[in-house]
Amino acid sequence: MSLQTNHRPVLVVDFGAQYAQLIARRVREAGIYSEVIPHTATADDVRAKNAAALVLSGGPSSVYAEGAPSLDAEILDLGLPVFGICYGFQAMTHALGGTVANTGKREYGRTDINVAGGVLHEGLEACHKVWMSHGDAVSEAPEGFVVTASSEGAPVAAFENKERKMAGVQYHPEVLHSPHGQAVLTRFLTEIAGLEQNWTAANIAEELIEKVREQIGEDGRAICGLSGGVDSAVAGALVQRAIGDRLTCVFVDHGLLRAGEREQVEKDFVAATGAKLVTVDERQAFLSKLAGVTEPEAKRKAIGAEFIRSFERAVAGVLEEAPEGSTVDFLVQGTLYPDVVESGGGSGTANIKSHHNVGGLPDDVEFKLVEPLRDLFKDEVRAVGRELGLPEEIVGRQPFPGPGLGIRIIGEVTEERLETLRHADLIARTELTAAGLDGVIWQCPVVLLADVRSVGVQGDGRTYGHPIVLRPVSSEDAMTADWTRLPYEVLEKISTRITNEVPDVNRVVLDVTSKPPGTIEWE
């Protein structure tokens, strides 16, 4: 069961753009709830959602191409405010009787637009930069629409019809390369559509707690698998606030954690929430399963399978200790909105992917899922966590893979190698925090090349130690990422400390590969 919000959504119609989720996030950053729906949605689907407004996303096609995605024409007759972006701007124009033409002037990248009045660009420079990505262009606006911007390749780069509460732009306001884009989107939502900005962390937390309370009921009991990450911690905190000690949190220590993570869960999380916590020490079980395993996918499968078995044992223990006559019927998961959209759940179809921190469960244990975060993006989860009083060490934590340090050791995973990597990782994290860079990077995997020996000189002799790789990346959603340009003095400090303080390491290297082509994790 999902916990649907009471807010009327702004529906972002996805025409196949890579930016549909980003648009939805930008709408929420404006303080208004949003959801993504496919362009195949009908007017009846939109009515059923009780939409507050529509935003039509960009897309890869020409509106004249065979099989080009189109919009149910009836949707534009529902009387809802509509904002078109790039392809969505052209599709809207086409549907409303305007003209979309192949001008022969393509625009890709930063482009100057010239503004001529209107609500969207009021107070902005008469000529300013935006991010364009189009071949066709609107040459004539639909009847009743006022043209408010143009560029060299787009005679109609923006238009508005305040009476119908409709507007659109040829450029991409949702990307950071359009410096005024967020202001333009917000103006549509608030000044043209007339929507209230009431999607805040405080409102979200209060609403979700009440929804959880309704779903689980007055006597229901729940289990939450904690991974040490942000999502499961915030999900657990929300449910604990809703049902108190009828929630049991389970934390499996698989021995592949970073320094201090078990203690952080056992002390900081419990202190902040008052949650009942069961910790299961499975370190030796995982190490024995990983003995001799070097192939990355085999490692992941071994870790995943053992985690399922460990969680099963922990769940069995919780069920045995439940008060006589009571049952534990609910399982809390930290599913986020991107998981829902990517699995097809955004259209009300398909099943939701299970989280790696829970995995499978025994056939004879059937839980009802509680997914309090399934309508939220990662930045909103962090904001709700802060609202619930979770410490910054938890809510500001960098993403960390389910298989843990096991996939950051290139080669066989052993206790000795884990200690080496744990030490190096702690130094890197400590120095990045001290330099105030935690908010700059998305994450910084630290990788041990355990099957590589590097010649070095330490003291007066030659050494054969292992290299450590630093992989700092910047990203908004982990779908794409760029390597972070860290200050040289910070890199120098990390390198010096690691080679001086971590035994058997004599070289530190920097990974400067973007994603694509390289993934964020090495394995």
From Swiss-Prot:
Molecular function per GO: ATP binding; GMP synthase activity
Keywords from the UniProt entry: ATP-binding, Glutamine amidotransferase, GMP biosynthesis, Ligase, Nucleotide-binding, Purine biosynthesis
The UniProt record lists the keyword Cell division: no
Pathway: Purine metabolism; GMP biosynthesis; GMP from XMP (L-Gln route): step 1/1
Domain Glutamine amidotransferase type-1: 9-198
GO cellular component: cytosol
Record-linked Pfam families: GATase, GMP_synt_C, NAD_synthase
InterPro entries: Class_I_gatase-like (IPR029062), GATASE (IPR017926), GMP_synth_C (IPR001674), GMP_synth_GATase (IPR004739), GMP_synthase (IPR022955), GMPS_ATP_PPase_dom (IPR025777), NAD/GMP_synthase (IPR022310), Rossmann-like_a/b/a_fold (IPR014729)
Positions of the catalytic residues: C86, H172, E174
Record EC number: 6.3.5.2
Catalysis: reaction(s): XMP + L-glutamine + ATP + H2O = GMP + L-glutamate + AMP + diphosphate + 2 H(+)
Residue numbers binding ATP: S227, G228, G229, V230, D231, S232, A233
Top EC class, one word: ligase
Domain of life: Bacteria
Domain GMPS ATP-PPase: 199-397
Job of this protein: Catalyzes the synthesis of GMP from XMP.
Subunit field text: Homodimer.
Identification of the protein by name: GMP synthase [glutamine-hydrolyzing]
Underlying gene: guaA
